[in-house]
Amino acid sequence: MNVVNNAAVARATTEHARLENWQLIRGHLVGTVSGDPDHGDGETIHTSDVLAVVKHRHAHTRNREYQLGSPDPNWARLLQLMRSSPDAALELVALHNSIHAPAVRIR
Protein backbone atom coordinates (compact mmCIF):
# COMPACT_ATOMS: atom_id res chain seq x y z
CA MET A 1 0.00 0.00 0.00
CA ASN A 2 2.86 2.42 0.76
CA VAL A 3 4.34 1.90 -2.71
CA VAL A 4 1.05 2.93 -4.34
CA ASN A 5 0.72 5.97 -2.09
CA ASN A 6 4.32 7.03 -2.71
CA ALA A 7 3.80 6.75 -6.47
CA ALA A 8 0.64 8.85 -6.25
CA VAL A 9 2.46 11.49 -4.21
CA ALA A 10 5.37 11.56 -6.66
CA ARG A 11 2.98 11.96 -9.59
CA ALA A 12 0.98 14.69 -7.84
CA THR A 13 4.05 16.75 -6.98
CA THR A 14 5.20 16.83 -10.61
CA GLU A 15 1.78 17.86 -11.96
CA HIS A 16 0.98 21.04 -10.06
CA ALA A 17 -0.08 24.43 -11.31
CA ARG A 18 2.40 27.26 -11.82
CA LEU A 19 2.05 30.86 -10.61
CA GLU A 20 3.87 33.73 -12.29
CA ASN A 21 3.93 37.42 -11.40
CA TRP A 22 2.69 36.46 -7.94
CA GLN A 23 2.50 38.25 -4.62
CA LEU A 24 1.48 37.22 -1.13
CA ILE A 25 -1.51 39.19 0.14
CA ARG A 26 -3.05 38.48 3.55
CA GLY A 27 -1.94 34.85 3.53
CA HIS A 28 -3.08 34.15 -0.05
CA LEU A 29 -1.13 34.04 -3.29
CA VAL A 30 -2.35 36.21 -6.16
CA GLY A 31 -0.83 35.65 -9.57
CA THR A 32 -1.13 34.44 -13.14
CA VAL A 33 -1.77 30.71 -13.28
CA SER A 34 -1.01 28.00 -15.81
CA GLY A 35 -1.65 24.27 -15.62
CA ASP A 36 -4.52 24.54 -13.13
CA PRO A 37 -7.46 22.30 -14.08
CA ASP A 38 -9.93 24.74 -12.49
CA HIS A 39 -8.65 27.89 -14.25
CA GLY A 40 -7.57 28.82 -17.76
CA ASP A 41 -3.92 29.52 -18.48
CA GLY A 42 -3.15 33.22 -18.06
CA GLU A 43 -5.98 33.81 -15.59
CA THR A 44 -5.26 35.85 -12.45
CA ILE A 45 -6.24 33.85 -9.38
CA HIS A 46 -6.48 34.28 -5.61
CA THR A 47 -5.48 31.03 -3.87
CA SER A 48 -6.84 29.57 -0.67
CA ASP A 49 -4.75 30.03 2.51
CA VAL A 50 -1.03 29.34 2.08
CA LEU A 51 -0.03 26.59 4.49
CA ALA A 52 3.65 26.22 3.62
CA VAL A 53 6.32 27.37 1.18
CA VAL A 54 9.02 24.85 0.31
CA LYS A 55 12.45 26.19 -0.66
CA HIS A 56 10.93 29.39 -2.10
CA ARG A 57 9.77 27.43 -5.15
CA HIS A 58 6.60 25.56 -4.14
CA ALA A 59 3.63 26.75 -2.15
CA HIS A 60 1.09 24.47 -0.51
CA THR A 61 -2.40 25.89 -0.04
CA ARG A 62 -5.47 24.23 1.43
CA ASN A 63 -6.53 23.05 -2.03
CA ARG A 64 -3.48 22.75 -4.25
CA GLU A 65 0.28 22.90 -4.65
CA TYR A 66 1.76 25.61 -6.85
CA GLN A 67 5.17 25.93 -8.44
CA LEU A 68 6.26 29.54 -7.97
CA GLY A 69 7.71 31.40 -10.94
CA SER A 70 8.88 35.00 -10.80
CA PRO A 71 7.19 37.23 -8.21
CA ASP A 72 5.52 40.51 -9.13
CA PRO A 73 8.44 42.98 -9.54
CA ASN A 74 6.68 45.73 -7.55
CA TRP A 75 5.97 43.33 -4.69
CA ALA A 76 9.60 42.12 -4.74
CA ARG A 77 10.78 45.74 -4.60
CA LEU A 78 8.50 46.38 -1.63
CA LEU A 79 10.08 43.43 0.18
CA GLN A 80 13.54 44.88 -0.48
CA LEU A 81 12.40 48.22 0.95
CA MET A 82 11.02 46.51 4.04
CA ARG A 83 14.39 44.88 4.68
CA SER A 84 16.31 48.13 4.25
CA SER A 85 13.86 50.61 5.80
CA PRO A 86 10.84 49.11 7.59
CA ASP A 87 9.27 52.50 8.41
CA ALA A 88 9.34 53.70 4.80
CA ALA A 89 8.00 50.35 3.62
CA LEU A 90 5.06 50.52 6.04
CA GLU A 91 4.15 53.95 4.68
CA LEU A 92 4.20 52.52 1.15
CA VAL A 93 2.01 49.59 2.19
CA ALA A 94 -0.50 51.97 3.79
CA LEU A 95 -0.54 54.09 0.63
CA HIS A 96 -0.93 50.99 -1.57
CA ASN A 97 -3.82 49.70 0.55
CA SER A 98 -5.61 53.06 0.49
CA ILE A 99 -5.35 53.19 -3.31
CA HIS A 100 -6.60 49.62 -3.74
CA ALA A 101 -9.33 49.79 -1.10
CA PRO A 102 -12.70 48.69 -2.45
CA ALA A 103 -14.97 51.54 -3.46
CA VAL A 104 -17.79 52.27 -1.04
CA ARG A 105 -21.12 53.04 -2.59
CA ILE A 106 -22.97 55.80 -0.76
CA ARG A 107 -26.75 55.88 -1.16
Report residues per predicted region.
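Short aromatic-centered micro-motifs
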Residues: A59
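N-terminal non-globular leader segments, chiefly Sec-dependent signal peptides
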Residues: M1-V50, P71-R107
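A short, compositionally biased
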Residues: A52-H56
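Short, isolated positions in well-ordered beta-strands
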Residues: E65-L68
